[in-house]
Amino acid sequence: MADNLVIVESPAKAKTIEKYLGKRYKVIASMGHVRDLPRSQMGVDTEDNYEPKYITIRGKGPVVKDLKKHAKKAKKIFLASDPDREGEAIAWHLSKILELEDSKENRVVFNEITKDAVKDSFKHPRGIEMDLVDAQQARRILDRLVGYNISPVLWKKVKKGLSAGRVQSVALRLVIDRENEIRNFKPEEYWSIEGEFRYKKSKFTAKFLHYKNKPYKLNNKDDVQRITEALNGDQFEITNVNRKEKTRYPAHPFTTSTLQQEAARKLNFKARKTMMLAQQLYEGIDLKRQGTVGLITYMRTDSTRISTSAKSEAQQYINDKYGEQYVSQRKSSGKQGDQDAHEAIRPTSTMRTPDDMKAFLTRDQHRLYKLIWERFVASQMAPAILDTVALDVTQNDIKFRANGQTIKFKGFMTLYVEAKDDKENDKENKLPQLDKGDKVTATKIEPAQHFTQPPPRYTEARLVKTLEELKIGRPSTYAPTIDTIQKRNYVKLESKRFIPTELGEIVYEQVKEYFPEIIDVEFTVNMETLLDKIAEGDMNWRKVIGDFYNSFKQDVERAESEMEKIEIKDEPAGEDCEVCGSPMVIKMGRYGKFMACSNFPDCRNTKAIVKTIGVTCPKCNEGDVVERKSKKNRIFYGCSRYPECDFISWDKPVGRDCPKCHHYLVNKKKGKSSQVVCSNCDYEEEVQK
């Protein structure tokens, strides 16, 4: 008979932990938060020292009833929610609902869901840390005060359904500021000169560097001509050889932010998908005979620290697999996070290799686990040693430079290289063995015109990185923030980069005009610092909120009285309604744009926006092939005559038949390339870069 009750957030976590604890423990799930501020009202009493009015979340009544039923039967109750501020707040809300004593040591935390870690945590229960709870409460109340005051103003003055929040408004600002930089950018001309040189049977390239021992800018064609006219023949001399040994160290194990960035670059995962998969790996995977095991440590962390035991196990694995020379000699275990003394995201055991785990994981789970495992193991490997050489190739005071690099010892690069490095610094560039005074022959001198480029738009990975660098938000907020600005139609993704929409820019301009603090980066960073101080017990949460709200409410009053009403006109669709004959307009819905009758609400006719690709349906030969989106936002191709014709393809038909079997050909993406292949047989054409 179980006389100990353990409460966790999710059924998956409950199932894993119950197997470890045995028959004397009953483990049940709260299904996340059980209490929150009400949706129908502010829920914060600004006249009573910002007292929050928590209620049971709608739909959670049966869960709470079940929790209370089990709590009555239990001799002892343990609250085992996640080891962060959010988890601490969930534990506190549970203790209030179950009427547990505040002084009770009933809180258990573990950074990984393995048998040893879970059992050990139950030997050291503690009380609920109210400083962590207060930091989470303060964040929640601040966000509620901002959202519930600004949003109604935007509904009244701009459009219903809009919102503005502390972190999402700054994220939107970053996207818009970058777009304005691009709009205002004026390209500037510049030139380069590249020379191809021969030494014996070897060829190498070098770039123009100096004229008369000084940097010389090539701003236009005249500058280039001045250099090329000063050259006399094709003989050059090696005037300097600089050989160095360069050490490259591996990256630290993942934090939440770096995991989201690397998964976006290497696996093409969105931040939300990365966190969903990481949660599954953390909460437990059924390994059949080995039972259910959490494969990675807690995935919401800003720490790169690792435990001594994890470090030792990884080094033992490296020694056995690669040899002693591949084991790192560095003593540092990484930085401790700003929020808590968590560990980095790592495998719970290095010995559970990606190959061994493949049979138990879905394809995407395995890809993410492999990324986490390789990054962690590589972080404990020896640095790579590179031999670099710089050659100065000179004639008539005109200097070209060639840079070469070869890998002397691969070290960690045997296993893993960061995505951002793949394109640039890791390629070997061998130069011939040359010494000062050697003569080389120029076979080509090629000037090239260039123009400066504007800064690139944000990818999801770069936006996450920038939010982290600016210290805006927390590990748990990056993915929801990016989700929110997309769902509100404030930004859109084009070629995997964020572009602000007209609506996003209108909302931003209003918030900037009337609520300047909300979109101010420095203000948002300072607020995060104050939340950290609350968590550390150095600040009172009510004072922090009071100081903010006293000035904020004046901004709200000014906006209500001074903000002018903005009319956002619907974009004409270019066709008439087939029901009533009124013009159709383009609207934005939950799943993207659609056509609706301008005579709404008298006429409620709507139509999907169909994008044809200029190819006749290969199945019925009557309809057109159109681009559609699945519920998961994945593009697929179907027939415009659906449901009469049920043609469907994930790959884009090209409008030609296979010369071998006469089935239709499709354009299949392969990384950054694409290839025309047959949908039925093995026919394929050359890869298109």
Swiss-Prot record:
Domain (Topo IA-type catalytic) spans 129-557
Name-wise, this protein is DNA topoisomerase 1
Task: Give the EC number.
Answer: 5.6.2.1
Instruction: Could you list this entry's UniProt keywords, alphabetically sorted.
Output: DNA-binding, Isomerase, Magnesium, Metal-binding, Repeat, Topoisomerase, Zinc, Zinc-finger
Gene Ontology cellular-component annotations: chromosome
Cite the binding residues for Mg(2+): 9, 82
Identify the species of origin.
Staphylococcus epidermidis (strain ATCC 35984 / DSM 28319 / BCRC 17069 / CCUG 31568 / BM 3577 / RP62A)
- Identify the domain of life: Bacteria
What top-level class of enzyme does the UniProt entry assign? isomerase
Query: What is catalysed by this protein?
Result: ATP-independent breakage of single-stranded DNA, followed by passage and rejoining
Gene this protein is translated from: topA
Toprim domain boundaries? 3-113
Checking InterPro entries in the record gives: Topo_IA, Topo_IA_2, Topo_IA_AS, Topo_IA_cen, Topo_IA_cen_sub1, Topo_IA_cen_sub2, Topo_IA_cen_sub3, Topo_IA_core_domain
Keyword Iron in record: no
Family as reported in the entry's similarity comment: Belongs to the type IA topoisomerase family.
Q: Where are the zinc fingers (C4-type)?
A: 577-603, 617-645, 658-681
Where in the chain is the site Interaction with DNA?
Answer: 33, 139-140, 143, 148, 155, 300, 488
Q: Which CDD domains match?
A: TOP1Ac, TOPRIM_TopoIA_TopoI
Under the subunit heading, UniProt states: Monomer.
The cross-references to SUPFAM superfamilies, in alphabetical order and at most eight, read: Prokaryotic type I DNA topoisomerase
